[in-house]
């Protein structure tokens, strides 16, 4: 049952998130800054001191840059100037957030509720936009949904040693 639903959710997400992912130019100035900082990280080989040109980018999550650099390195190491490889972590994170919402909603709702919640989240214009941008927002959403799922599972299963959460 879950396999069919998750497959359906992934297909729905891809139908919303793939159109334009490879062709639309940078949508936001912060997207360009994330991509440029990740590009500089790959060119310099310095994965600790994250910079946009000469300005440090210490206020943004470092994991975003690392995932973007890994994505570019795996998918198109010779095409550092194209924006689409930098967007793949956001695309995957948006899909993970939607799948996480499905499982989280299944804890509270009857079976069609989880799939409906996932479809509603996947079709929101904000998440569609974030899945198309090389920024940290979709990654942060995925981490929050996963954390919420872990918390509700801990609460529902009465795992006493995790009550400190």
Kindly give the residue locations of the regions a language model identified.
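Membrane-integral, polyisoprenol-dependent glycosyltransferases
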Residues: 1-165
């Amino acid at each position: 049952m879950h396999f069919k639903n998750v497959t359906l959710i992934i297909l729905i997400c891809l139908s919303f998130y793939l159109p334009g992912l490879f062709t639309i130019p940078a949508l936001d100035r912060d997207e360009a800054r994330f991509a440029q900082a990740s590009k500089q990280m790959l060119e310099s080989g310095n994965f600790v001191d994250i910079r946009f040109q000469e300005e440090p980018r210490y206020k943004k999550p470092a994991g975003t840059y690392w995932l973007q650099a890994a994505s570019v390195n795996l998918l198109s190491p010779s095409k550092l100037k194209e924006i689409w490889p930098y967007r793949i972590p956001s695309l995957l994170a948006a899909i993970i957030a939607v799948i996480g919402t499905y499982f989280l909603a299944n804890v509270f709702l009857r079976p069609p509720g989880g799939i409906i919640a996932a479809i509603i989240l996947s079709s929101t214009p904000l998440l569609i936009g974030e899945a198309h941008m090389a920024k940290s927002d979709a990654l942060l959403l995925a981490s929050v949904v996963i954390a919420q799922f872990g918390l509700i599972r801990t609460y529902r299963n009465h795992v006493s040693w995790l009550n400190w959460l």
